[in-house]
């Protein structure tokens, strides 16, 4: 398979994953997720197994209303069965009944297991001042 074909496939998988989250399609999200999957973000680091992921998705405290993966995504193949994708994303969510829009830089590591790609690692860094000066602390 040509490199550009695999790159397109990885970007397609990433979009499908986001769409599964938006649609609250737990089965598709689980099919696309390694067991366990390492996740990092503003809340810290976690290793999430399928049972935990399913529970999280079914009882989410937020709703993903829309998402846009911005142009400029980068895909790097580390071998026949490992690929990394990094991109910027805009997310529109409803959190505790209120609309929230955020921009973030995300990355995922995809591995091919038994002939199918699964996400083994996902990271998200919310865009903004790298020193956090644009964030408001609540007492």
Regions found by a protein language model. Give the residues of each.
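A beta-strand edge to alpha-helix "cap/lid" segment located at domain peripheries
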Residues: 2-31, 38-139
């Amino acid at each position: 398979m040509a490199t550009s074909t695999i790159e397109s496939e990885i970007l397609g998988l990433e979009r499908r994953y986001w769409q599964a989250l938006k649609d609250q399609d737990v089965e598709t999200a689980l099919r696309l997720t390694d067991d366990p999957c390492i996740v990092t973000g503003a809340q810290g680091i976690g290793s999430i197994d399928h049972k935990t992921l399913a529970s999280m998705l079914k009882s989410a405290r937020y709703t993903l209303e829309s998402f846009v993966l911005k142009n400029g995504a980068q895909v790097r193949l580390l071998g026949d069965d490992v690929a990394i994708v990094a991109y910027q994303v805009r997310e529109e969510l409803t959190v505790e009944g209120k609309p929230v829009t955020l921009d973030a830089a995300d990355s995922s590591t995809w591995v091919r297991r038994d002939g199918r790609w699964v996400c083994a690692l996902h990271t998200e860094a919310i865009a903004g001042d790298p020193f956090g000066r644009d964030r408001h602390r609540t007492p």
